[in-house]
Amino acid sequence: PFGSGCTYIAKTFLESAGYRYLSLSDILKSEFHDTDPPSRTAMQDLGNQLREQDGADILAKKACEIIDHAENDKWVIDSIRNTHEIELFKKRFGTFYVIAAWADQETRWKRVESKYERNRVSFDADDSRDSRENAETGQQVSLCYQMADIIIINNKNIISPGTDEYTKLETVVRRYINIIEGIESFSPTEQETLMSMAYANSMRSSCSQRKVGALIIDDYGNVFSSGYNEVPSSERPCKNTYGKCYRKYLRDKFSDELTSIIHDDEAR
């Protein structure tokens, strides 16, 4: 989500490693014709509108056009907010990796409060919408997180290069760059190993919309128990009955009925 430091990491560490920066938000901003910078709400509205009109992966397609006409062979793409954008990039590029940056809400608020003129209510509204819209063409940051190959914790405020926090973040990012480019290989850390175990547990869930795995460990990393979310024992999984999540089934059914009503009214 915004304020987590994705842009900072991309421009500070990946650009210096030879990656060319490309932002889907910048592509979206080019669709605005007003001279004043658009608000985040306006950006969200236009992004949803474009995805509804031209497909949920329209911004990713525009990014691919830019990449196809450039000579660079290494790119870092910022501001991905819809799962269809990730799916297109993975189909289009054989070595495409999703790197997510995470910071807690309070840290992110402190980073962006001046842009919001210290209006916390507006920040909370934008933050909620940015992460949890249900529409296929909406803001799906939370779902994009679930598709991440790498998650970088960026919960510290970095004042300037050379500080301990800057060096720690740089070391983490460089490590993943070297792994991606095949320069070095590393054994996974204890935390990475445990998270992989939790993820493997999540795959046991028959819920078609959200899969969550968890581990209970002690201070030394010993696993005491593991688990995952599951459909209630008395219920059948939605995908067995409806072929998809029941909520999505209802949304699609409502959308089809509404479209039919509109077309009938236009035909009269």
In which residue ranges do the predicted regions lie?
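The conserved Walker
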Residues: F2
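Conserved lysine of the Walker
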Residues: C6
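Hydrophobic positions on the alpha1 helix immediately C-terminal to the Walker A/P-loop
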Residues: I9, F13
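ATP-dependent small-molecule kinase phosphotransfer cores
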Residues: R20-W75, I80-E87
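Small-molecule kinase domains that catalyze NTP-dependent phosphoryl transfer to phosphate-bearing small molecules
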Residues: I58, I86, E113-V173
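Conserved phosphate-donor/acceptor-positioning beta-strand/loop module used by diverse small-molecule
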Residues: D78-I80, K90-Y116
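Short, basic/aromatic recognition patches
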Residues: F186-V212
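A short, polar/charged loop-to-alpha-helix boundary motif
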Residues: Y228-R268
